[in-house]
Every structure is written in C-alpha cells, then in structure tokens.
C-alpha cells in the first residue's frame, strides 16, 4: 500500500534525509586507497549517532552494518569488513540511511579512490546524470514508468545496461515502502504519481547489458 505523506511528515523526513546525506558526504570523503570499508562504515555510524539519529540499515533484515559498501563490479549490499581494503582506482558505492522522529532517509553515491580509469569515471557520471533525469520525470500526475524510462533511456543511449533485479522504493516510517521504483519502464504506464508520495530513485548501471 502506498502511503501519502502530509506536509508536516515531509518536513520531518527532510531532517532524516539531511542527516543521511551529510553522513554519506563524510563517509565519501574517507574513500582513499588503504582505508578499509569497516573504517568508512564506522565514520558513517558515528556521524549519524552524533546528530541524534539512528542508522536505519543496521540490523535491518539482519544486515550487520550502518552502510552497504560495494566496490567496482559489486552492485549493492556489500558488507563492510576490516579485511576489505580500498585500492587505487576503485570505485566505491556507499548506501546508507538515518532515522529520526520516526522517519527515514536513504542516500547513496559512488566515490572514486584516487585516480580512476576514464571508463569508470564515465560510468559514474552517466549514473549520476541518470538520477537527475529520473528526478525530472517524477512529477505529480505522471506515471512511475516515466521515471524508469527516463533513467533507462539515458543510460542505454550511452551504451550501458540498467540493473533490473533491484529497484528503488517508497520511503517513510519504513525504510522500504511501496511502490517499487524500477530503473526501466514505459512512459505513461505504471502507478500514478501523486502529491505526498516520497520515493527513492536508485539508478544501478552496468557496463554493457545487465
């Protein structure tokens, strides 16, 4: 069931999203060769707790950490480890969230460790831009398929494939709410986008086909 949020609820969610986004920024700044993914996770945990929120990924579905940290060809759900050392040229995706006042934030980004290849930079840049295309398509009165199509067409036009096995989602008092938000779709099809819907658009892109 899709839960529409009031203006007051959206304001509360903005605080959760702000803390989550700031924690992501701080964690991303720590992405350097020689650093372990556990160290990055600990930085995110400390930031979220310091600002009065709870890390909402921790223990969710049994997940043992604050952030999903995935390197290079790993799509999502990488588990931080003291043994996983970041190397020069890695691209490191960090996905995390914060919960405060009963509402969730959910943010993700990919960071470069030192100097990365031109191919890796292009992949990251395309993924980032596809997010903005999805956001532009997410307008009240539109359809969920408009959002997925915007992401899909932008990436496929540049030779990339979108991941179909994992999707974005609604966000609110639960981290994962309806609807699912795929990175592919047909314009004018799917769930109607209504005022008060809050969704996480999460482009996941592969070189070549997914």
Kindly give the residue locations of the regions a language model identified:
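Active-site neighborhoods and metal-handling regions in enzymes and metal-associated proteins
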Residues: 1-210
